[in-house]
Structures are given as structure tokens and as C-alpha cells.
């Protein structure tokens, strides 16, 4: 290339008249922009650029609306209020998007924001939109006082924390349109009263509704949060691992152990068996057993079953639900889900529910699929046991009445029996009741005076009840007549009918009290004089088993034996001894001996095979001798007398 023909870049560099530019090692075009790191104090402006820029720099719509970056109103908002985080974020966004237009502008020194004051910023009457924004900011300045103190969140008010979280939520949206829309919703939310549902609450409810449209999501929510009153206390009791640690290591008081120490404990406990089919079947079986025990405690039927052990139940149980309680029930037909309703009737192991939704008919629902609408009232298990015991005659003791002892949680005791033992001096001293002590009780014709008083009261109460029933029948007939003529009953008739019902209820209560008193005397004075001569062998055997259960229960109060199999074996052997004593007081037959042999055979089948030899040596040998003696005396005598 010849020297006469030069490139435009070299020509522009040689024709320049600026000495500073000729000394620069870089040759730039006239329209080039000089980076800030290569500029000196004087900014280089190309002639073409300066000619084009005749007025103020180009502004974004937001800057034109708000008066520009250097607007006094915006600066005052920045200095006087910390609620303008959203406005500052918008300004930063605009400055970053238009950085090329302001690259040659001098850098602005902004004052650091101060703590928010409860002062109103000066409004800008020239712009209506800006005035609305300023009014909104003025309305929320007092709510966000303390928002600048981010280094110490403990000093922040609840409103400040809420606003900070809201601002972080707004920052998730990138465009100005989305931020403006969310700010509008935020303003609407702040202007609402406490009774209205907030915008964010509606959004959360909509998200939750969309989630619950899926069947698996509904199933997960039911399994995770829907607990019946019975299951809630079972699943919320002490962790199984904590129970095993407490029972296996009673002297371990410190739970802050190292990883090596916990590893040693896990080795001693062994490998757990979980997530297998057998494991889940056993867990379901244990859960159903606990449910059955809780139902028996509610009903009081545990007194009739000696095999029920209450020590594995929770220390507190919820109060049983009654008719009229509002509940949430899990149903599968005609709809599958959880619906609200009211208990209409109580049935065994469930309730009859009338639902609020008219499309669902009244349904029988199990008690394990019902959740009370409200707070559960928890009561001690000893309360339910005392309620069940109070319904029994005072002469009849419960067969099993074991509750937790707060001082010894691994032992069980009967509260009512322990009280009576403390007063009487021990289980073998006999009951200490004045009705059994002939010296202190007043007798009239060989009958206790209190027994006769109860009998007279009961007779009078029965006569009164007959009159009330007769009066109630007449009122029912009048009600049918009035129902035929009109749809309403007179106020006087309603009051008379209600008074009759209340009187009848009071009479029934008094009758129950006197009947219990008569039953008490009957149990006390006829228990020792029961004639077994006319009783069948099976009835005698059952009576002896019940007496043996009472003896074992009383004697176990001081020993606190927890092995159920051992207690059952002791009870069976005691029943055999009582049966032998009963047979020794009368003439027996071959049927009685057969009944005794059946009892011994049942005991032999219940014990462990390793103990059969001991049972034969120490029990059956003596029973064989007794059997021989009875055959020679009682049974043969009975046979001879029958022949004569």
C-alpha cells in the first residue's frame, strides 16, 4: 500500500490538532466512547456526540414521571423514609438499564438513609400519580419504624418484620409491571380490616386448594395431620427409643453423648427390625390392642377381663365425645374425604354423624376416624378408673384396676384399693366396714337398720315413680290431642310436661342410690353364706375363680408383680385350692371330681413345657392324693346313699 493512500483511522490521527490526543498511544474514532479507566480529569467528548446532545439526557418513563434522579421529592423520600426500598430498587433497576446513557455524567454523591421518622414527606402537587404514591408511603411510615435497624432484628417491630418479608417477596419479580401489580395488591391488603381475608391469604388458600385436588396429596394430609382423639395420645406418647433407653439404662441421666457413646448403646440394643411386612402387622396389632383398652376404660368393661393391662396406656386420655359435639369425620361413601358434622348418637366403637353438607346422609363412623372440632380435654386415667369403680357396689372390688404411679412409673397400683389397705392395715386383715362389725351396727330383727331404711325408701320411691309415669301417660295423650288441633303447645302444658320429666329423673337417681345400698348389704352378708350344694360344678368353679382373683389383686398391692402370666398362674392355683375347700364341705360326686380334673388339665396346658415336670411333682401328686381320699369318703358315700 502506498503512502499517499492512507486509512481513515491514520488520517484522523495525523490531522488532529489536540496535543493531548497526539501524545496518547491509542488512536480512536471521533464517535468512540472512552472507557472510564482510560480517561483523565477532562472528559473527552466527540464533536458529533456533543452536537447530537442538544438538551438534557434521555430519561426513562419512570424518571420523566418522577422528575428525574435528582428530583428533590425522590431525594427527600430516600432520606426521610425507609419504606422506599421498593422505589430505590426501581431506581437502581432503571440506572442499570440506562448505564450507557449516563456514562459521561458526573457521579452523584448520595447521602446515606437515616432512620424513619413519623413525618409526612412534602407532596408534589404537580403530579397526581406521584402524590398517590406519597400518600401511600405516608400511610405506612409508622408501621415500618425500626426497619433500618437490620443489625439488631430483636428491636424491630412486628409490622417492620412483616414489611421486610413482603419486600423480599416483591424482589422476586423482575419487571416494573409485575412489581407495580404486587405493590397494588400490598396496598389493598394493608387497607383491609381484620375481619376480611387478606390477598395473600386468598393466594395461599388457592395454592392449598390446587394442592388438595390431587388424591395423593389429600392422602398425605390425612395421614400426617388427621388424628382421632384415641390415636392422638397413643402416637404422641414417649418415643420407643427413649423408653428402651430409660428401661435398659436407668442410671443414664445425661443425654448429651458423643457419637462413639451412642454407637456403643446402639450395639447393646441390637439392630432394629423396621419396614418389613411382619413389623407393620405387629404394629397394627399393638395399636388395635391399645385402642381396645382405651375403649374398655371408657366403658368400664376392663373390670370384667383380668387379661387387660393398663400400664402401657398413656397417662392422660381425652374426655369421651358425647352427643352434640362438632367433629370432622373421614368417610368414603358417597364422597371420599373429611367433612364436618355433629354427633347424633353414640354406638359401640363409633358414632352416628349428621354432616353439614346436605348431600351426605347420616353415617356411622368409627371412633378412630373422627377428630373433635376444638381443644381436647385431657384427664388422668385414674379419673376414668374411679368413675368405673364408683358405679360398682362398694363390696365388689374390680378384678384389675392398675394405674400409673407418678413416683414409680414402671410399677402399677390401684388407687382405691391402696386407700382401703392403708386404712385397714393390710390386705390380710380383712375389710374394715362398720356394716360387717356387729358391735357397731344397729340391728333390728337380725337386720341392719340402714338396710331397712334403704328398703323403706325404695318402696316409697317406687310408688312415687308409678304416679309420675301415670301422669306422664296422661300428658302424652293430651299432647296427641293438641297436635291434632294445632301445631303448637301451650306454655302451661310445656312447663307441666318438663316438670314431670325432671321429677321422674330425680326419682330414678334416688332409686339407684337406694338400690346400691341394698345391693351392698346383700353382697356383704350373703357372700359367706352362699350354699353351693345346689350349684353346678361349673358355677362353683367360676365362683372360686372370682374369689381367687380378688385375693391375688389385694396381695399384689405391696409386691407390685408385673408379669401377667405369673399372676394368672397364681390365680388358677388359688382357684383350685378354693374349689377343693368347697368340695370338702359337702358330699361330692364324680362330676365335681371331673370339674377339678379339668381345672388341673387347663393349668398344665398353660404352663411352659419345661415346667411340666415340676408341676407334676409339686401339684398333681397332691391333687391325686386328694382325689383318692374324696373317692373313698365323699363320692362313695354319696353313691351308697343314692342306692339306698
Curated annotation (Swiss-Prot):
**Pfam families referenced in this protein's UniProt entry, alphabetically:** DIRP, LIN9_C
What segment(s) does the record annotate as region Disordered?
Answer: 1-77
Q: Does the keyword Translocase apply?
A: no
Where does this protein have compositionally biased stretches of type Basic residues? 50-62
Q: Which InterPro entries does this UniProt record tie to the protein?
A: DIRP, LIN-9/ALY1, LIN9_C
Q: Name one GO biological process term.
A: DNA-templated transcription
Does the UniProt entry include the keyword Transferase?
A: no
- Cellular location(s): Nucleus
Q: What happens when the gene is disrupted?
A: Decreased protein levels of DRM complex components including lin-37, lin-52 and lin-54. Double knockout with the programmed cell death regulator mcd-1 results in 100% lethality during the L1 stage of larval development. RNAi-mediated knockdown in a ced-1 mutant background results in reduced somatic cell apoptosis.
Sorted alphabetically, the keyword list is: Developmental protein, Nucleus, Repressor, Transcription, Transcription regulation
Q: Which GO terms describe its molecular function?
A: DNA binding
Outcome recorded upon mutating residue 341 to E: In n112; weak synthetic multivulva phenotype. Temperature-sensitive multivulva phenotype in a lin-8 n111 mutant background
Role summary = Synthetic multivulva class B (synMuvB) protein. SynMuvB proteins are required to repress the induction of vulval development by Ras signaling and probably act by forming the multiprotein DRM complex that represses transcription. Required for the development of sheath cells in the hermaphrodite gonad and for the development of the male spicule, rays and gonad. In association with the zinc finger protein ztf-11, negatively regulates the expression of non-neuronal genes during neurogenesis.
The entry assigns this protein to a family as follows: Belongs to the lin-9 family.
Oligomer status and interactors: Component of the DRM complex, at least composed of lin-9, lin-35, lin-37, lin-52, lin-53, lin-54- dpl-1 and efl-1. Interacts with zft-11; the interaction is required to suppress the activation of non-neuronal genes in neurons.
Give the protein name, as stated in the record.
Answer: Protein lin-9
Please tell me the species this chain comes from.
Answer: Caenorhabditis elegans
Lineage of this protein's species?
A: Eukaryota, Metazoa, Ecdysozoa, Nematoda, Chromadorea
Q: What's the name of its gene?
A: lin-9
Amino acid at each position: 500500500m502506498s503512502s499517499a493512500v492512507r486509512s481513515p483511522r491514520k488520517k484522523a490521527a495525523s490531522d488532529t490538532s489536540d496535543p493531548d490526543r497526539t501524545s496518547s498511544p491509542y488512536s480512536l474514532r471521533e464517535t468512540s466512547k472512552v472507557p472510564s479507566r482510560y480517561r483523565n480529569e477532562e472528559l473527552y467528548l466527540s464533536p458529533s456526540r456533543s452536537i447530537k446532545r442538544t438538551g438534557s439526557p434521555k430519561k426513562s418513563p419512570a424518571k420523566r414521571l418522577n422528575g428525574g434522579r435528582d428530583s428533590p421529592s425522590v431525594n427527600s423520600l430516600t432520606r426521610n423514609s425507609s419504606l422506599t426500598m421498593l422505589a430505590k430498587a426501581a431506581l437502581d433497576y432503571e440506572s442499570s438499564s440506562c448505564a450507557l446513557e449516563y456514562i459521561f455524567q458526573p457521579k452523584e454523591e448520595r447521602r446515606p438513609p437515616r432512620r424513619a421518622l413519623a413525618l409526612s414527606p412534602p407532596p408534589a402537587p404537580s403530579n397526581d400519580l406521584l402524590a398517590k404514591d406519597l400518600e401511600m408511603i405516608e400511610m405506612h411510615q409508622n408501621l415500618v419504624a425500626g426497619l433500618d435497624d437490620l443489625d439488631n432484628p430483636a428491636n424491630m417491630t412486628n409490622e417492620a418484620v412483616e414489611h421486610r418479608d413482603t419486600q423480599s417477596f416483591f424482589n422476586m419479580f423482575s419487571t416494573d409491571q409485575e412489581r407495580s401489580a404486587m405493590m397494588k395488591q400490598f396496598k389493598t391488603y394493608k387497607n383491609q380490616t381484620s375481619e376480611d381475608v387478606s390477598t395473600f391469604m386468598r393466594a395461599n388458600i388457592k395454592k392449598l386448594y390446587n394442592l388438595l385436588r390431587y388424591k395423593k396429596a389429600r392422602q398425605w394430609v390425612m395421614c400426617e395431620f388427621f388424628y382421632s382423639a384415641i390415636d392422638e395420645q397413643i402416637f404422641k406418647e414417649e418415643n420407643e427409643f427413649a423408653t428402651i433407653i430409660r428401661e435398659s439404662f436407668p442410671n443414664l441421666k445425661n443425654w448429651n453423648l458423643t457419637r462413639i457413646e451412642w454407637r456403643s448403646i446402639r450395639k447393646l440394643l441390637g439392630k432394629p427390625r423396621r419396614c418389613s411386612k411382619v413389623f407393620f402387622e405387629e404394629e397394627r396389632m399393638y395399636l388395635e390392642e391399645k385402642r381396645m383398652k382405651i375403649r374398655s376404660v371408657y366403658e368400664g368393661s376392663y373390670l370384667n377381663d383380668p387379661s387387660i393391662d393398663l400400664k402401657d396406656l398413656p397417662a392422660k386420655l381425652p374426655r369421651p365425645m358425647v352427643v352434640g359435639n362438632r367433629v370432622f369425620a373421614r368417610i368414603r361413601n358417597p364422597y371420599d374425604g373429611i367433612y364436618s358434622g355433629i354427633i347424633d348418637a353414640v354406638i359401640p366403637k363409633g358414632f352416628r354423624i349428621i354432616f353439614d353438607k346436605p348431600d351426605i346422609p347420616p353415617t356411622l363412623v368409627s371412633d378412630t376416624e373422627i377428630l373433635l372440632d376444638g381443644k381436647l380435654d385431657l384427664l388422668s386415667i385414674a379419673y376414668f378408673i374411679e368413675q368405673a369403680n364408683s358405679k360398682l357396689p362398694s363390696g365388689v372390688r374390680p378384678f384389675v384396676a392398675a394405674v400409673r404411679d407418678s413416683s414409680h412409673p414402671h410399677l402399677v397400683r390401684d388407687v382405691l384399693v391402696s386407700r382401703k389397705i392403708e386404712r385397714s392395715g393390710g390386705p390380710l386383715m380383712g375389710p374394715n366396714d362398720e356394716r360387717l362389725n356387729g358391735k357397731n351396727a344397729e340391728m333390728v330383727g337380725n337386720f341392719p337398720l340402714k338396710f331397712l331404711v334403704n328398703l323403706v325408701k325404695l318402696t316409697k320411691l317406687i310408688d312415687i315413680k308409678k304416679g309420675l309415669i301415670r301422669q306422664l301417660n296422661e300428658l302424652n295423650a293430651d299432647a296427641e290431642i293438641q297436635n291434632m288441633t294445632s301445631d303448637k303447645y301451650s306454655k302451661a302444658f310445656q312447663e307441666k310436661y318438663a316438670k314431670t320429666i325432671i321429677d321422674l329423673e330425680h326419682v330414678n337417681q334416688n332409686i339407684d342410690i337406694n338400690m346400691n345400698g341394698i345391693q351392698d348389704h346383700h353382697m356383704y352378708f350373703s357372700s359367706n353364706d352362699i350354699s353351693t350344694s345346689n350349684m353346678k360344678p361349673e358355677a362353683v368353679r367360676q365362683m372360686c375363680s372370682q374369689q381367687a382373683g380378688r385375693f391375688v389383686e389385694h396381695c399384689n398391692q405391696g409386691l407390685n408383680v408385673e408379669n401377667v402370666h405369673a399372676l394368672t398362674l397364681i390365680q388358677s392355683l388359688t382357684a383350685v385350692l378354693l374349689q377343693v375347700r368347697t368340695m370338702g364341705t359337702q358330699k361330692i360326686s364324680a362330676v365335681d371330681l371331673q370339674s377339678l380334673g379339668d381345672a388341673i388339665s387347663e393349668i398344665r396346658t398353660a404352663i411352659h413345657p419345661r415346667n411340666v415336670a415340676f408341676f407334676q411333682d409339686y401339684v398333681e401328686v397332691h391333687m391325686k392324693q386328694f382325689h383318692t381320699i374324696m373317692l373313698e369318703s365323699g363320692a362313695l358315700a354319696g353313691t351308697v346313699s343314692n342306692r339306698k
